[in-house]
Amino acid sequence: MDRVRSLIGNRRGRRHNRQHPPYPHSGSPSTVNLLGANGYGDDQSTIFARENESLETSANEGDDSADAATLNTAVSEGSTIGDLQRQGYVNRAPRFTSERAMPFVSVLLQRGFFAFPSEESLQLFLHNKRKLDNIDPKRGLGLPLFHAISLNLVKSLFSDQNTPVMRIYKYVMIDSQCDKPPLNSEVVSRINENVSIYKYEFCTILKKMESHNFSSRVEHDFIFHRKDEPDVHIPMINYNQRKNADTAIHGLNLRWYGTTSLASPFGSNSINLLVLDDTMASYMNQQTIEEFDSYSRSRPTRPLGYLPVWARYTDDKVSVIPKKRTLRVATLYLQETDSFDDGSSLTSTNYTEMGSNIIENVPWDSQILTCMCMLLHEYESRKEKRHTAWGSSTTYMLNGPAGLLM
């Protein structure tokens, strides 16, 4: 027994004398801070809120299994834009000066859905009982900005040609004393002797698919029709086996982060538009999945959670019960800037009776991004409607019996 006691005592002594590795000079474990939306200053806001946990800081950009690493990313306390540029992470995101909330709304027994330029405009639309004959010509409140109508979505799944999948119509107010209505437009309402509301096709969206080694490259061509100017073509590209979709505006590569793949049975209710670093791989530059993955592996890139957010799509204010025959189906929050002014407005704003009109004050890039988001909403929301009884009944109320076949 004495020998057993001595052996136990020796083990306890050795365990007590073990030295633990010392902490850094500060005497406490090193800390990390997440990039968060409250980080005002030179850094643009990023996707995810500040947390206290230490998380992984790297993820393969082309690997869907690494998406979780981009949701929570960490950086040292001393990181600045200058430090990132010295490391090769150059991001040319514009300095945003304001934010616009654009509600997406469906009207019962009316095909398609609408986008409003502001919350105030939507509330006045509801107050006017969805009528457009009581619009203030000076401000334009109560008037939708866009009306999106889907076309041939089922047919487009089996066609590799340029198939039209959506048309987006824009509402404008025209003073006949100063300007002419857009071509192929129709009169919606007459406000007074001079000012009338017109509706015309603003954007046509074509879909084309190309097969590449067990994957399909999907390109949506957004064709914007401008008055007395050539049409503007802006592509949006994704792969049907991959999440997310890429596009480019003003020379900046952008990514709609959060869209689901074609194989996913469920839709997404949260999508963020990210401004990519200049060195990041993009479907706009790499023509195949193999090129995209090879480029991603050959260059150091930071996780997507670090990147500036230009726009945010969410269903946080979605309606469950129709209010005045309308349902709010989503909201798009857009950051806006004064940096881009290419004079792409379709109509003149020098009207005798029209001052600061909210419809004509929506920036050109915001109109482009809204049209893209309306198409993404159509794709994602259709997946959700297939899996809920509420979705099926709502589809019937919104579009009638034909809505269930779309």
From Swiss-Prot:
Residues 1-36 are annotated as: Disordered. It comes from the Eukaryota. To yeast YMR316w. This is Uncharacterized protein YNL165W. The lineage of its organism: Eukaryota, Fungi, Dikarya, Ascomycota, Saccharomycotina.
